[in-house]
C-alpha cells in the first residue's frame, strides 16, 4: 500500500469531518470495538450487522438509536451512510468481507488473523490498492506507546545484535469445553450465512459463538490467533517480511475429551535472515508463567515485553576465559582466568510500564488515516506477511515437515503438496464473489 492513498473511489473525509462507522460481527472483540469507537469524539456509529439476531439486537442497542441493524452484511455494505467498517467476524470471513468492503468504497479495520489461508492476504492487499482503501489490521500492540519505545531502543542497538526471539502464550483451560452433540442452530441464527465460504457442516455449539477457533475450517488455532500478535511485533521491530523456513510440531495432546481440532500444544521454529524465532503455546499448562509475550535476545542482554510493559535484562561483561569452568586450576596451555576485572553491565537495566490504552489508540490511528489517507500503523501488507508466517507453521505441523519459503515470490520451494495448502476453495455461491 502506498504511503498516501487517493480518495477518488470513495467519499473523502476532511480534517474536521466525522467518520460514519459500521460494524460487521458482534462477538467478544466486536463488543470491545464498539466500545472503543463509540468513545472517539468524531465517530457516528450508523450500522451493525450480525447473522445471529439476538447479538445483532444487542449490538444495535449498544451502538445507539441512530444505528441500523442488518442480518446480512452485504446490505450494510450497500448503505451509503457507512464510510468505514470494522470487521470482527470469525477468521474465515475476514478476507472476503474486506475485499467486498473495498469494492463498495469503504475503508476497513479488520481483526487479526487477517486471513484463513495465505493467498487471501495478497487478494486483500490488491483490493486495497485497486480501490484506494485504508486497511488497518487489528494487531493493536503496535499502538502501545511502550511497544513503540521498545522498538526504538532495539533498532538503536540497546541490547546489541538480536539473534534470537522467543514468543509464547501459556494458559490452562483443562478439562476443556466438552463434546456437545450436533443439533439445530439456535433460534435467530442464520447458520448458512455464518458458514459463508467455509465447508457445509452440521451445526455444533462449538463451531460458532467463540469456540470456532478450535476448528480448522474457520481458524488456524492459537498459532494464528495469539501468535499473530507477537509475530507482528517481531516483524515490526526486526523489519522483516517473512522467514526462509518454518517447522512446527504439536497437536491436540491434552484436551482430548472435547471436540476441538486445532493444537493445544504447539512449538514453531522460524528461520529468518540473521536470527531465529521460536513460538510456543500451551492450552493445558500455565506453569511458572514463562509463556507470555516476546523476549528479544541480543549480544548485550534481552528485552522482555508484554502488554503490561517491558524490561531490559542486561548481561554482565565477563572475560570469555573466565566463563570456562576450572577445577583446582587449568591444565597447562588452557584458558587462564583474568584475576583482576570489575564486572559491569553491557547496557543499562530498564523497566517501563504500559502507559496507554492500545486498543483505543489503534482505533484512533485508523480514524486519523481514514481522514488523512495515510497508511495506518498496522497496514494490510504487514498483516498479510504476519498471517502468512503463522500459516506456514500450521502447514508444517499438519504435513510433518519443514517448509521452505521465499518471501519475495510468496512461494513454497520444492514441495508441491505443501504449495497446494496456500489456498482453499470457497463454498458456493461465495466462490463467485472473487471472479
Q: Where are each of the predicted segments found?
A:
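N-terminal Rossmann-like dinucleotide-binding module
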Residues: 2-63, 141-144, 234
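Nucleotide donor/acceptor-binding cores
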Residues: 17-19, 133, 163
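Residues forming the Rossmann-fold NAD(P)(H) cofactor-binding site
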Residues: 31, 95, 228
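Glycine-centered tight turns that cap/initiate beta-strands
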Residues: 42, 81, 158-161, 242
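Conserved SAM-binding strand-loop segment of SAM-dependent methyltransferases
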Residues: 67-72
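N-terminal Rossmann-like NAD(P) cofactor-binding module of classical short-chain dehydrogenase/reductase
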Residues: 84-86
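Beta-strand-loop-alpha-helix segment that lines the small-molecule cofactor/substrate pocket
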Residues: 90-91, 95-143, 157
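Contiguous beta-strand/loop segments that form the cofactor/metal-binding neighborhood of enzyme cores
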Residues: 148-149, 161, 166-221, 225-381, ...
Amino acid at each position: 500500500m502506498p504511503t498516501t492513498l487517493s480518495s477518488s473511489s470513495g467519499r473523502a473525509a476532511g480534517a474536521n469531518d466525522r467518520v460514519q462507522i459500521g460494524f460487521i460481527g458482534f462477538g467478544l472483540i466486536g463488543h470491545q470495538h464498539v466500545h472503543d469507537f463509540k468513545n472517539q469524539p468524531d465517530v457516528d456509529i450508523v450500522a451493525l450487522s450480525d447473522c445471529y439476531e439476538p447479538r445483532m439486537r444487542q449490538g444495535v442497542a449498544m451502538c445507539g438509536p441512530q444505528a441500523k441493524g442488518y442480518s446480512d452484511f452485504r446490505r450494510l455494505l450497500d448503505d451509503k451512510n457507512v464510510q468505514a467498517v470494522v470487521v470482527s467476524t470469525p477468521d474465515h470471513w475476514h478476507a472476503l468481507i474486506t475485499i467486498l468492503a473495498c469494492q463498495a468504497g469503504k475503508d476497513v479495520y479488520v481483526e487479526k488473523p487477517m486471513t484463513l489461508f495465505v493467498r487471501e492476504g495478497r487478494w486483500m492487499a490488491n483490493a486495497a490498492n485497486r480501490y484506494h482503501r485504508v486497511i488497518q489490521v487489528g494487531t493493536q500492540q503496535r499502538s502501545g506507546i511502550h511497544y513503540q519505545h521498545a522498538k526504538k531502543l532495539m533498532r538503536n542497538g540497546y541490547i546489541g545484535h538480536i539473534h534470537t526471539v522467543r514468543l509464547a502464550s501459556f494458559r490452562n483451560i483443562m478439562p476443556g469445553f466438552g463434546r456437545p452433540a450436533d443439533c439445530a442452530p439456535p433460534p435467530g441464527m442464520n447458520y448458512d450465512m455464518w458458514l459463508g465460504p467455509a465447508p457445509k457442516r452440521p451445526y455444533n455449539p462449538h463451531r460458532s459463538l467463540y469456540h470456532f477457533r478450535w476448528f480448522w475450517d474457520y481458524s488456524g488455532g492459537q498459532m494464528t490467533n495469539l501468535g499473530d500478535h507477537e509475530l507482528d511485533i517481531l516483524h515490526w521491530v526486526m523489519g522483516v517480511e517473512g522467514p526462509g523456513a518454518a517447522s512446527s510440531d504439536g497437536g491436540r495432546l491434552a484436551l482430548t475429551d472435547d471436540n476441538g481440532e486445532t493444537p493445544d500444544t504447539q512449538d514453531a521454529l522460524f528461520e529468518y535472515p540473521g536470527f531465529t524465532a521460536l513460538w510456543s503455546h500451551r492450552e493445558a499448562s500455565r506453569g511458572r508463567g514463562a509463556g507470555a509475550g516476546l523476549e528479544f535476545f541480543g549480544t548485550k542482554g534481552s528485552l522482555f515485553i508484554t502488554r503490561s510493559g517491558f524490561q531490559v535484562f542486561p548481561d554482565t561483561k565477563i572475560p570469555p576465559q573466565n566463563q570456562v569452568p576450572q577445577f583446582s586450576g587449568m591444565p597447562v596451555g588452557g584458558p587462564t582466568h583474568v584475576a583482576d576485572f570489575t564486572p559491569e553491565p553491557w547496557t543499562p537495566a530498564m523497566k517501563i510500564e504500559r502507559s496507554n490504552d492500545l486498543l483505543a489508540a489503534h482505533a484512533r490511528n485508523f480514524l486519523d488515516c481514514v481522514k488523512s489517507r495515510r497508511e495506518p500503523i498496522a497496514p494490510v501488507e504487514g498483516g498479510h506477511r504476519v498471517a502468512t508466517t503463522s500459516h506456514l507453521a500450521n502447514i508444517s505441523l499438519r504435513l510433518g515437515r519443514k517448509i521452505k519459503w521465499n518471501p519475495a515470490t510468496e512461494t513454497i520451494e520444492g514441495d508441491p503438496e505443501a504449495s497446494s495448502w496456500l489456498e482453499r476453495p470457497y463454498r458456493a455461491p461465495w466462490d463467485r464473489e472473487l471472479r
